[in-house]
């Protein structure tokens, strides 16, 4: 039987760092207000790199780490809500940039859950025994979709990309999954990004800026996401104590604090980096994973169990338990 495993992780970030103090020069806010409410101290902002540029750099790093040629890649999935264009997809641009001539490529649009959804799909593709190697990347340039006069959103988000190489193997590594969507609550977190109005349409152009009902999203994460994680652990007969690390979407430190208490796990098992990068949507989990590998916390030798969980626009939420 064919299974899949995560064999490499990599990330890439824009060079420009924007601190809370920098934001206080253009917004009515300050470092204490931002950091006490979110845990965020700074974020990366792209000056010229598009989402496909960040994603392509991650793909190149993954190939370098694995010491393989791009022609060995069978598929590329990029999770993003900030594509360079409607078409071609970011994944197609990555495929062309790295020369993965044998790979099919497509984007996954599931906001902050996108990387988890994409990783679950990659597992199924490889388990079909039709494909051997795939790149799964989360990449965002959210700064282009922020109203820089709205402190409720401008202070939260950052740009970046991270990803993994998923390969076929003979032992099960993807142990359990739980994926959800509730479109009836979609208006709690939106970004218009509509094309120009046609001469045959009566609709007005929608604002491209990210809009969020912060309280509704906070409550959703604490209630629905925590419940789904607890259910996943119970259904898979894995205890919270058996999980070495929880890698959750990096939205807000208060969310992680409350979720750790609800799940009944030591807070230090919940890894975080939002203080440095802010909320990078689909990129947050793979960036965190890659950094954790670099720090020696995650070994990529199959000896650890980690729980990955994303949640955000859609509304969407999903979790995976993976031996890594």
UniProtKB/Swiss-Prot annotation:
Q: Which NCBIfam families match?
A: fabH (TIGR00747), PRK09352.1 (NF006829)
Domain notes per entry: The last Arg residue of the ACP-binding site is essential for the weak association between ACP/AcpP and FabH.
Report the function annotation for this chain.
Answer: Catalyzes the condensation reaction of fatty acid synthesis by the addition to an acyl acceptor of two carbons from malonyl-ACP. Catalyzes the first condensation reaction which initiates fatty acid synthesis and may therefore play a role in governing the total rate of fatty acid production. Possesses both acetoacetyl-ACP synthase and acetyl transacylase activities. Its substrate specificity determines the biosynthesis of branched-chain and/or straight-chain of fatty acids.
Q: What is this protein called?
A: Beta-ketoacyl-[acyl-carrier-protein] synthase III
Which intervals of the chain are annotated as region Disordered? 181-202
Q: What is its EC number?
A: 2.3.1.180
Record keyword Protein biosynthesis present = no
- Give the UniProt keywords, A-Z: Acyltransferase, Cytoplasm, Fatty acid biosynthesis, Fatty acid metabolism, Lipid biosynthesis, Lipid metabolism, Multifunctional enzyme, Transferase
- A family per Pfam: ACP_syn_III_C
């Amino acid at each position: 039987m064919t299974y899949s495993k995560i064999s490499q992780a990599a990330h890439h970030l824009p060079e420009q760092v924007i601190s809370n103090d920098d934001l206080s020069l253009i917004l009515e806010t300050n470092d204490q207000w931002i950091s006490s409410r979110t845990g965020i101290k700074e974020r990366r902002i792209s000056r010229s790199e598009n989402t496909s540029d960040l994603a392509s750099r991650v793909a190149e790093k993954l190939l370098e780490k694995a010491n393989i040629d791009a022609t060995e890649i069978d598929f590329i999935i990029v999770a993003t809500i900030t594509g360079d264009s409607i078409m071609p997809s970011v994944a197609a641009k990555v495929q062309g940039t790295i020369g993965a001539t044998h790979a099919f490529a497509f984007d996954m649009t599931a906001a902050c859950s996108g990387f988890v959804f994409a990783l679950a799909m990659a597992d199924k593709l490889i388990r079909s025994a039709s494909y051997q190697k795939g790149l799964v990347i989360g990449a965002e340039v959210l700064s282009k979709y922020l109203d820089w006069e709205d402190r409720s959103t401008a202070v939260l988000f950052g740009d970046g990309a991270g990803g993994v190489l998923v390969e076929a193997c003979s032992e099960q590594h993807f142990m359990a999954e739980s994926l959800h969507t509730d479109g009836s609550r979609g208006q709690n977190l939106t970004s218009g990004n509509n094309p120009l109005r046609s001469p045959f349409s009566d609709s007005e152009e929608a604002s491209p800026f990210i809009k969020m009902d912060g309280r509704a999203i906070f409550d959703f994460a604490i209630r629905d996401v925590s419940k789904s994680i607890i259910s996943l652990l119970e259904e898979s007969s894995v205890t919270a104590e058996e999980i070495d690390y929880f890698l959750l979407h990096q939205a807000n430190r208060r969310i992680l604090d409350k979720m750790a208490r609800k799940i009944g796990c030591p807070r230090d098992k919940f890894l975080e980096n939002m203080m440095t990068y802010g909320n990078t949507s689909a990129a947050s989990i793979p960036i965190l994973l890659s950094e954790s590998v670099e720090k020696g916390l995650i070994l990529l030798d199959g000896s650890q169990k980690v729980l990955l969980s994303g949640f955000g626009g859609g509304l969407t939420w999903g979790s995976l338990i993976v031996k890594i």
